[in-house]
Amino acid sequence: MNDERRIAVLVAFAKIYTQNAQDDVIDILDRYLTDLFAKTYRKEQKERLRTIKDLDKAARQLREACITLLEHTDPSIHPKVAVFKKVPEKDLIQAVQIVDSLTCPPDQTLAYSELLQYYGTIRKFLPLLMEEIELQATPAGLPILQAWNFVKEHGDSSKKRWRNAPLVGLNTNWSKIVVDKKTRTVNHRAYTFWMLEQVVDALRRHDLYIVGSVKYGDLRAQLLQGEEWKAIRPNVLRSLDWSLDSYESLAPLKEELDLAYHQTVENWDNNPAVQIETFAGKQRITLTPLQKLQESETLEILKKRIQDMLPNIDIPQLLLEVNRWTGFMNDFRHISEAKSRINELPISICALLISQACNIGLRPLVQDGVPALARDRLTWIEQNYFRAETLTEANTRLVDFHSQLDLANMWGGGEIASADGLRFFTPVKSVHSGPNPKYFGTGRGVTFYNFTSDQFTGLHGLVIPGTIHDSLYLLQCVLEQDTSLQPKEIMTDTAGYSDIIFGLFGLLGYQFSPRLADVGKSRLWRFDATSDYGILNPLSKGRIREDLIHRHWEDMLRVAGSLSLNKVNATHLIQALQQNGKPTMLGRAIGEFGRIFKTRYLLLYLNDENYRRKILTQLNRGEARHSLARAVFYGKRGELHQAYRAGQEDQLGALGLVVNAIVVWNTRYMESALQVLRNRGHTLDDNNIARLSPLGHEHINIVGRYSFILPEEIKDGQLRNLTYKEDRLME
């Protein structure tokens, strides 16, 4: 590497890692404050339990006083005298003080008194943080930026100067702690904690942003705008099939929604699965769950025959054989982009894939006397060949190869995909993991949020700390995948979804199809208040705000264009638009647009049992794929021991790649087995073939010692001999 290239690499390294470090610092601050707030709240709750007897006594005294007051009817005796006769004034005052000190408002989730004890810890790092992090604000974030700058300038000032602290945005609960009612002085410790809570929240919404940051940067600057938007606008409109005229764009959507209503109403009497019932005086739709689709005897026989015919194989041989067909290991290139290839590189790549995907490390794979499996060589190749870029390219090659197999196309055409999360406990300390008692107990973990195509292949995945708002990452996952399969309908399991997500999917030409656990909680929306939708009239009173859509239409198109061209991160944009349940005006407009697609989807979901079955079938494919991934990722009790995001992404990317290799190998050998059965005179039902799955692994040796030597007869691409029994084939 010459001097100019070396300097360029160093400058690029410094810039990128400065950006990453800034993002990590904010992530750590967010995690620290979240943990601190939770810890102090739990501590206060324990303290309240310890004093429950005092609280009970005080509450009983107040009860006696209230009963006396309510039952008092003697006009000759003052009510206060009657109360004090029952409960002495001194005891009553003490009871009020106890209740005041031991209780808190129902909407208070912070233990303020406990929290302020950690002010000294905060001040140890806060001045340096404020010096290194350069915050800027959108108009909505200016009050919070003023509070940040005030603490930055006056953190160690006298109490007098704190009287001038900006208090815009201070809510009722914080106000009681921050500002003394009598003296109007500001508690600098409470103010600092309030400011930090607001800053972190504003950074999530992008009301505040960090100059030069990737995750917390200024989203407005990333969107297409000005002359750049005008120049590219015709291409965006053409590719997304929208008109710049909002009225022209909405006209066909109105017709489609009206037609969906009428079709649902007309078919209502022939749809026994859907009913309207009354709960607590309100009408709600109820939907009978789908019954399990039974397997026919011929399907069970076919599955058994195919499984018996598949050859037994070690996982390394499977990977090497798939490489013979596809050449996917050629996508693992040296980081320097050098074109020279070292001897027996596929064997080394294969060993590294197994070490990562099976979560067993290098030790079980190192073999003395085999240069390709020497520890030093494996470590060197891991450092220079294994990275997100090469894993993605190798995975793309597998997906593309699999999509050309006839059997894969009998399962689906690639137009549909499902998204779901695979949870991993992370016993190591990591800022890139998060809590969730349901999945991780008292520890932390990550979610590998990934896509499964209708051909059973995995398309793309993202690592999410903990399990936070999986649906936020859905659109990002869709837009980042670049295989030959381009699904247009994305199905997800029951999870939180919003009108904004429906709207963004609709703008970009995708159908968002979540499985609904409680369809009765969903609302139906309409354009025309006078339209007669029969039995659905009481349930479709909400009107779509066309005026908002018309007013913000070009900005909505600009957002869609920016997303489609990867100018802006979809997850960050959705967070900014939603603003913790208080969407921006543009977010509201996109949400109104999303109500069109959501209502149309809900009506189809209610009206068509086959559509509901299709969603369930695809989601089951994703769950079955996750079961295979669990079987492969067997080492270290299935726990992920990667502390850094890059390591987590690389290891789980390797897992997805190995699972795809298993799918490719199984599909090709299943094709061969089906052809043998046809050649022997068996009549095969296409409906049964469509219900086969390439996710079986009983014939694959995943656990144990491995062989990296391919039999001579298959080195040139031939298939292994099938292991079938004559009597079973002749049935």
What is each model feature region?
Residues R333-E337, V366-Q367, A394-R397, G412-I416:
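Short coil/turn segments at secondary-structure boundaries
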Residues D368-D406, N436-E554:
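Catalytic or ion-translocation cores adjacent to nucleophile or general acid/base/metal-coordination motifs
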Residues C350, G414, G443-G445:
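Histidine-/acidic-rich catalytic cores in large beta-rich domains
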Residues L398-G434:
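Structured nucleic-acid-interacting core domains from mobile-element enzymes and related host factors
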Residues S531, P538-E731:
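Long, compositionally biased intrinsically disordered regions
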Residues M1-E255:
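Long amphipathic alpha-helical coiled-coil/heptad-repeat bundle
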Residues D258-D368:
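Structured, charged N-terminal subsegments at the starts of enzyme catalytic cores
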Residues D420-L422, T494-Y497, G520-S522, L573-G581:
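A glycine-rich phosphate-binding loop feature that marks nucleotide/adenosyl-phosphate handling sites
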